């Protein structure tokens, strides 16, 4: 938008100033200040409106322009008459169905279909819950196929628990056998030691008897030699 479209000519400015001055709602001092600001802004715009396109004015210039336009509009606009109380509330006439667009009926049909679908979905859980409550009373006896399938489903769990039990029982049996072998080994060692002790005791008794016999023979020989030496006169 060009600067000339945004700003009115000087004759319109003078006319706006006269209206602002004659308006009973605006005091003289603010009107003079507004006119002064408007003239400065208009002079700045007139100096630059023949130049090639340039950057937009700064925020201060935009603020002055908007403030001047608002003041001019409020001064030129006549006061709005007060509406009578009877016309304050107006009844809006309903739009006939024939004047509705074609797509609106399709939307209504789609909404009704969605409502019916939702109502059927809400009613189906109640039906399923009632049938579930009534099913235990009239439930048929379990068939052999279902029992076989239950056994098939429970078989893997049993197979999983069996190896653990078998491993534990095998471990206990191994420990028991190892303890039995250890006791048997110790018992055999004790028996061997007892036999060796018995043989050693027998050997000891035999050696003791031989020792006593030898001592007795030595005493007997000593006595004979003494008698012999006495007989020869070698010993007094």
Curated annotation (Swiss-Prot):
Residue span of region Leucine-zipper: 193-228
Superkingdom assignment: Eukaryota
Keyword terms of this UniProt record: Activator, DNA-binding, Nucleus, Transcription, Transcription regulation, Unfolded protein response
Induction comment from the UniProt entry of this chain: By ER stress-inducing agents tunicamycin, DTT, the calcium ionophore A23187, antimycin, monensin and H(2)O(2).
Region of interest (Disordered), ranges: 117-185
Major location (coarse): nucleus
Subcellular localization, as worded in the UniProt entry: Nucleus
Annotated region (Basic motif), positions in chain: 167-187
Domain bZIP stretches: 165-228
One GO CC annotation: nucleus
Record carries keyword NAD: no
Family classification: Belongs to the bZIP family.
Name of protein: Activating transcription factor of chaperone
Organism of this sequence: Bombyx mori
Lineage start: Eukaryota, Metazoa, Ecdysozoa, Arthropoda, Hexapoda
């Amino acid at each position: 938008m060009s600067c000339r479209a945004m700003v009115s000519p000087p004759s319109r400015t003078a006319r706006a100033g006269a209206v602002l001055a004659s308006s009973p709602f605006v005091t003289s001092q603010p009107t003079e200040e507004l006119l002064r600001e408007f003239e400065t802004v208009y002079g700045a715009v007139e100096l630059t409106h023949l130049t090639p396109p340039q950057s937009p004015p700064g925020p201060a210039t935009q603020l002055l322009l908007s403030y001047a336009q608002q003041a001019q509009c409020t001064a030129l606009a006549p006061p709005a008459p007060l509406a009578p109380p009877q016309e304050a509330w107006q009844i809006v006439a309903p739009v006939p169905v024939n004047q509705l667009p074609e797509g609106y009926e399709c939307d209504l049909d789609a909404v009704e279909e969605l409502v019916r679908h939702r109502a059927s979905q809400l009613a189906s859980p109640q039906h399923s819950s009632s049938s579930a409550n009534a099913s235990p009373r009239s439930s048929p006896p379990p068939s052999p196929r279902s029992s076989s399938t239950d056994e098939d489903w429970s078989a893997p769990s049993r197979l999983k628990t069996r190896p653990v039990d078998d491993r534990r029982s095998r471990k206990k049996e191994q420990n028991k056998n190892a303890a039995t072998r250890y006791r048997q080994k110790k018992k055999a060692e004790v028996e061997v030691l007892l036999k060796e002790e018995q043989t050693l005791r027998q050997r000891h008794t035999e050696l003791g008897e031989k020792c006593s016999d030898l001592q007795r023979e030595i005493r007997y020989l000593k006595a004979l030699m003494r008698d012999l030496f006495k007989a020869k006169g070698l010993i007094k």
